[in-house]
Amino acid sequence: MTHSKRWLEEHEKDPYVKRAKKEGYPSRAAYKLLEIHQKYKLFKPSMNVIDLGAAPGGWSQVAKDLVGPKGVVIAIDLLPIQSMLDVIFIQGDFNEPEIFNQLEAIVAKKTLTGQVDLVISDMAPNISGIKNVDQSRSLHLVELAWDCAQKLLARGGTFLVKVFQGPGVDRFLINLRPYFNQVKFLKPSASRSRSSEIYILAGEFLGYNQRV
């Protein structure tokens, strides 16, 4: 059996995939975020949130449900996402100055401080099947997400990002720790056990220019 056929069979049998279809989420990834929230209380009503690499939209949908009508969720991705009531969507690469400026302008317009309480990212690279290549690309996306977060995250805010385990992750964590009071690795049960994906949860942002 080829890798693709094996993946399709597992995908069709996956209980989270079946649950997502039943409950109206665009992907099983929603349950990873819900599980993390249930344990760490990421979201509060009226929060302002940026979802980087938001397609197909599951995390944005969860975020909007949890921050409520007074909260703001800004989703950004190169790919389109399903239309969601009250989620602001930007299609483009947030690493491009023009798109980042658009993101920054929306944050300034929609928040009192020009900053957000939470930056989340479930981004993954296009998978090549070559483990070290995919892991390196994943780490690069994490670094881009952090570069964006440090510019728009309010003091006391939270940064949640997915990464594939491998070289450079521990070094990234060492570099990240001075900017937050709490940094930890997470592996939600909704993540497939054979997947190398983990999540970095960094809480109580100290401010980019105020690190200890």
Curated annotation (Swiss-Prot):
Asked if the record carries the keyword Ion transport, the reply is: no
The domain of life is: Bacteria
Residue runs in coiled coils: none
Give an example GO cellular component term for this record.
cytoplasm
- Residues recorded as binding S-adenosyl-L-methionine, renumbered to this chain, are G57, W59, D77, D93, D122
The entry's localization annotation reads:
Cytoplasm
Q: Which residues form the active site?
A: K162
The alphabetical list of record keywords is:
Cytoplasm, Methyltransferase, rRNA processing, S-adenosyl-L-methionine, Transferase
Q: Which Pfam family is an annotated match for this chain, by its short name?
A: FtsJ
Q: Which reaction does it catalyse?
A: uridine(2552) in 23S rRNA + S-adenosyl-L-methionine = 2'-O-methyluridine(2552) in 23S rRNA + S-adenosyl-L-homocysteine + H(+)
Cite a single GO MF annotation: rRNA (uridine-2'-O-)-methyltransferase activity
| EC number from the UniProt entry | 2.1.1.166
* Functional note: Specifically methylates the uridine in position 2552 of 23S rRNA at the 2'-O position of the ribose in the fully assembled 50S ribosomal subunit.
Similarity comment text for this entry: Belongs to the class I-like SAM-binding methyltransferase superfamily. RNA methyltransferase RlmE family.
Q: Which HAMAP family match?
A: RNA_methyltr_E
Protein name per the record: Ribosomal RNA large subunit methyltransferase E
Q: Which gene encodes it?
A: rlmE
